[in-house]
Amino acid sequence: MSEVNTPGRGRPRAALTFDDGHVGNAALLPVFIKHGIRPTIYICSSIVTHQRTHWWLTPGAQRAGVRRLIKLPNAERLEELASYGFHQHERSIDTPISGLSREHIEAMLPHVDFQSHTRFHPTLTRLARDECTEELACSKQEVEEITGAACEHFAYPYGRYAARDVEILKATGYKTARTTLVGWNDEKSDPYRLRAFDIEDNSSVQWFAAQMTGVPLAWRILPLGAIKAAFIRTLGLTGIRKTRTNAGNESAT
């Protein structure tokens, strides 16, 4: 993320980011090295290196409904997960470890930028102010302890945040925060509300390139007339207008 903030000599740039710090990210290291890519991985700092499981991957969360749990006040969510035997501060015993190990991160450090995604991946808007401050401040400190480098960038869990959370991020020393809103960023973008494109695991290079143009996004969210108008503007066909002949038929000139 820091490299993207530097001048690009007029060329557009893309930052490749991953969320959560899943153990499977370690298998991508040879790909990063081969293509000279330095991605940013936003890690849950109290899950990675601790032999723990991301809470939504546990059997209890799956049974209770992850989407519903995300919307609960944090204390209620943790209480319900505890009823299924999950305690976020404890080491995973009955479920596979889902976070990167310290050995993984040490091997990846020369080629990967690790930044913050909170400690345990709560919904920020469902936290009390003191809880939110603790998550953001402690995660920043933990990431710096793990990597030995400054932690200045953040990604909102589930893309959910409020003005209060932005204030806390600024006060805690973060310089940017990435949302899940779709779109591009430029020099006018709010650094604490950065947009992104969600790329699925099975996306081809061609589909990735297509998404970067914004055409698939426009096709999904814009009315057909707006898409047509955009293409006309792109092609420079601004001189097209409709006139009516004597016979009452329309023709383009």
Predicted regions and their residues:
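C-terminal active-site subregion of NodB/CE4 polysaccharide deacetylases
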Residues: M1-T17, H22-N25, K34, P39, ...
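Metal-dependent polysaccharide deacetylase catalytic core of the NodB/CE4 family, i.e.
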Residues: R11-A14, I33-A162, R193-L194
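Short amphipathic alpha-helical segments and helix-helix/interface helices
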Residues: L28-P30, R102-E106, V166-K170
